[in-house]
């Protein structure tokens, strides 16, 4: 935190246009402890909504991948709760892989069930929601189906399913997998757990020989398309890895719950701003390179669309190739 304050204060000539002054370490510490994370969460929601409106016309804009990523915390965060695997927090995200657009559902303790957070989010009509077996909640599945939306997930091992009808197999080969079976199923039990919606089970075999059963309420897509939708879920794992590597959310500036949540939301706000800037200025660079250049040129006046190019030389100022006080070398 002292290094952050020192680096900021070293750029004092740029503070005027930001309406800021010098920064003290105690100011950062107080803000981390007292500033409400809800303000940052709302700001990120507005930015993500703006990105969503810009990409609404895309063909793949209606695919939503839902997952959570662990945020392990050290021994100094003795307030953090454990779920048996790690102690810390979890960040729950809805991800549109077509335009790399994430939305933060919530940041919770590690012991909060994923399904509890997933069903609290709004269901988008016509969207396809892809998630793993941790989001198993029949009431939420009914709400998705009632909204005219679809889900693709994996059934739990203790979920009793009976085959109602075998569907004919058309194309079987997908990218990295082969379809083994396509069946319409129903719950074997007749208790409260029975779902009053049509279900379909698609069994696929990956190239490594592992077999995976998928459960969906989508009866229109082909079995290969259903398998490809679930395979796309791994794109959110790549997003989590990218965020942790490049947005400074492995180490935190504070040890209290409030400060850590603020830093997580601030990182997501930075991600959304960078995506908006790259899209608005038609940046052709790879996104990671663009992020690195923005960090390098943060306190310089540069055109975002040409951030990789050196600034133009002032034509009104005569340039000197040498200075009279410059040391010269004379070769005999």
Role assignments for model-derived ranges:
Residues 1, 32-35, 42, 58-62, ...:
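Single, function-defining residue in the core of a domain
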Residues 1-58, 62, 72:
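Gly/serine-rich nucleotide phosphate-binding loop at the start of the catalytic core
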């Amino acid at each position: 935190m002292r290094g952050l304050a020192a680096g900021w204060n070293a750029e004092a000539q740029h503070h005027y246009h930001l309406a800021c002054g010098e920064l003290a370490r105690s100011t950062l510490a107080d803000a981390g402890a007292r500033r409400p994370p809800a303000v940052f969460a709302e700001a990120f929601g507005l930015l993500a909504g703006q990105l969503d409106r810009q990409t609404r016309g895309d063909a793949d804009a209606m695919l939503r991948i839902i997952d959570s990523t662990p945020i392990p915390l050290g021994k100094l965060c003795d307030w953090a709760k454990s779920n048996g695997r790690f102690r810390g927090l979890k960040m729950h995200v809805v991800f549109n892989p077509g335009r790399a657009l994430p939305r933060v559902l919530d940041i919770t303790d590690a012991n909060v069930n994923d399904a509890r957070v997933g069903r609290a989010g709004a269901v988008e009509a016509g969207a396809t929601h892809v998630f793993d077996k941790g989001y198993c909640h029949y009431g939420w599945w009914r709400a998705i189906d009632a909204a005219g939306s679809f889900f693709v997930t994996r059934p739990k091992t203790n979920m009793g399913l009976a085959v109602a009808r075998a569907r004919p197999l058309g194309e079987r080969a997908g990218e990295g997998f082969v379809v083994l079976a396509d069946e319409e199923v129903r719950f074997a039990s007749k208790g409260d757990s029975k779902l009053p919606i049509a279900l379909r089970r698609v069994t696929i075999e990956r190239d490594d020989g592992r077999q995976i059963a998928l459960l969906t309420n989508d009866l229109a897509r082909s079995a290969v398309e259903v398998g490809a939708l679930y395979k796309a879920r791994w794109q959110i794992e790549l997003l989590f890895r990218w965020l942790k590597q490049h947005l400074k959310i492995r180490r935190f500036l504070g040890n209290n719950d409030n400060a850590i949540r603020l830093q997580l939301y601030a990182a997501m706000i930075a991600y959304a701003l960078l995506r908006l800037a790259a899209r608005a200025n038609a940046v052709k660079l790879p996104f990671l390179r663009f992020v690195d250049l923005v960090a390098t040129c943060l306190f310089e006046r540069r055109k975002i669309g040409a951030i990789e190019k050196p600034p133009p030389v002032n034509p009104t100022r005569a340039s000197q190739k040498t200075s009279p006080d410059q040391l010269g070398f004379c070769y005999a």
